[in-house]
Amino acid sequence: MPRRKRNAGSSSDGTEDSDFSTDLEHTDSSESDGTSRRSARVTRSSARLSQSSQDSSPVRNLQSFGTEEPAYSTRRVTRSQQQPTPVTPKKYPLRQTRSSGSETEQVVDFSDRETKNTADHDESPPRTPTGNAPSSESDIDISSPNVSHDESIAKDMSLKDSGSDLSHRPKRRRFHESYNFNMKCPTPGCNSLGHLTGKHERHFSISGCPLYHNLSADECKVRAQSRDKQIEERMLSHRQDDNNRHATRHQAPTERQLRYKEKVAELRKKRNSGLSKEQKEKYMEHRQTYGNTREPLLENLTSEYDLDLFRRAQARASEDLEKLRLQGQITEGSNMIKTIAFGRYELDTWYHSPYPEEYARLGRLYMCEFCLKYMKSQTILRRHMAKCVWKHPPGDEIYRKGSISVFEVDGKKNKIYCQNLCLLAKLFLDHKTLYYDVEPFLFYVMTEADNTGCHLIGYFSKEKNSFLNYNVSCILTMPQYMRQGYGKMLIDFSYLLSKVEEKVGSPERPLSDLGLISYRSYWKEVLLRYLHNFQGKEISIKEISQETAVNPVDIVSTLQALQMLKYWKGKHLVLKRQDLIDEWIAKEAKRSNSNKTMDPSCLKWTPPKGT
């Protein structure tokens, strides 16, 4: 069968101008004497492709025109002859009845001049094939006999035209888009149904697993409803308090807040003194049965109020983690070391650390606690420990009191050890950015000695030449030694070095959350001790800074936090609050770890030259 040529208008984008997905035929009697008719056939596929090119440009209004002036011209243009022109008039095919002769189509060319002259008789142009076209008695829908063949042709042509366009390629699923596909909760025996927050139907992590927290999905939903109800009541009471409260400079607590404080004090008085024998047996049985796959039983360990507060914090943290997972900011199982075997401890990591890729893909990392070398398996670690001769950090021991020692390690002389120490610290610090460039720093490593060696407690790093007088660049206490007073000892030791150097020091910003809490506590203790021993009437922040080696900015911020700094009659006054001093003295008397202090007489150190 001979192939028919296409009759199309030349558009600026190089495609045939057509707004319909049917085979059209048009016979014009007024042009039969002057213009030879040319036959063309437009398939569904070519019509769809031309339609997609025309949809991007605004459609001009179809104008009526008079018969005495020719308003169109037919022209035979092939695809290879089409050239883009800056201004091309819009063309629309006219539908008419199919004649028994040949299949023909003529394209009407509306010029801008004629559309302006006939603006009073405008009509809406035909829309897309899915839209509504102007209906008339001569409109006939013609279907192609080879629909599947036409669709395959259109698909092939569209792939060729969009070969260089990446937007036409199938989009790859990201983690958060395929989060609910082929995933399950890692807790043994869990079917991934329910969520700790009570707001989701499924979960895929331990943080949102009701079974891990010894709860059921229904119990989580009931607790969520109770929390929402309490939040609504609290918001309503806050609105009432805001309406009744005047905008004063010093606002006293409201009656509702005072009642709530008394209620909390009464609830905490009901705390059980200890566990009974039956409860201890129950807890031990639960621990032996489930091990680390379930959360330990927490009932009767503290007051009901504190336990409920802890449960709320758990649910809120789980909700925040769920949002981060859905946004793709947390990808579980990809380049994340979950645990490390460090000496006799197994530590859960908090953050990602840039270990080499072959180690970062492991879920568990094995590490020598003396030389800090990291390994892939328990066998490699056992063989290494049999040959490792290190029993303490490298460098000079500059402090020793009892079993506590501090070693000064130069990052230039012991580069590998300091790099491994930084990689280890990044597992527990979020804002740490120093990993490999350790040569300009000194590292002060605190250890605790026993018959097997000196075990790492924590460390802090310090620039050799700090122009801003930073006495700490990075500080870390190992998780197994936290909440035992060692962090405050490291901070005190850094200020002890500043006193020997006769400088005023301050930690480098930004501080981590735990670091800020530790430093606030240390500054508070230093100021209260100084005010307790001070007997004069006038005090100077500069004198406090010179005696304690604490930066004046840190002193002022701590005084403001304690509400001990006031402005009165054009002067700044430091108030000596005896109630805070008495409270601090009582806490100092109750502390059992009185040996967790740094003794300046045990320091054997001189400042390095050039600092």
UniProtKB/Swiss-Prot annotation:
Organism: Homo sapiens (Human)
Placement of covalent cross-link Glycyl lysine isopeptide (Lys-Gly) (interchain with G-Cter in SUMO2): 323
Record's catalysed reaction(s): L-lysyl-[histone] + acetyl-CoA = N(6)-acetyl-L-lysyl-[histone] + CoA + H(+)
Protein name: Histone acetyltransferase KAT7
Record gene name: KAT7
Residues annotated for Zn(2+) binding in this entry: 368, 371, 384, 388
N6-acetyllysine carried by residues: 199, 277, 432
Pfam families cross-referenced by the UniProt entry: MOZ_SAS (PF01853), zf-C2HC (PF01530), zf-MYST (PF17772)
GO cellular component: chromatin; chromosome; chromosome, centromeric region; cytosol; histone acetyltransferase complex; histone H3-K14 acetyltransferase complex; nucleoplasm; nucleus
SUPFAM superfamilies, per database record: Acyl-CoA N-acyltransferases (Nat), CCHHC domain
Biased composition (Polar residues): 96-105
Zinc finger annotations (CCHHC-type) as residue ranges: 176-219
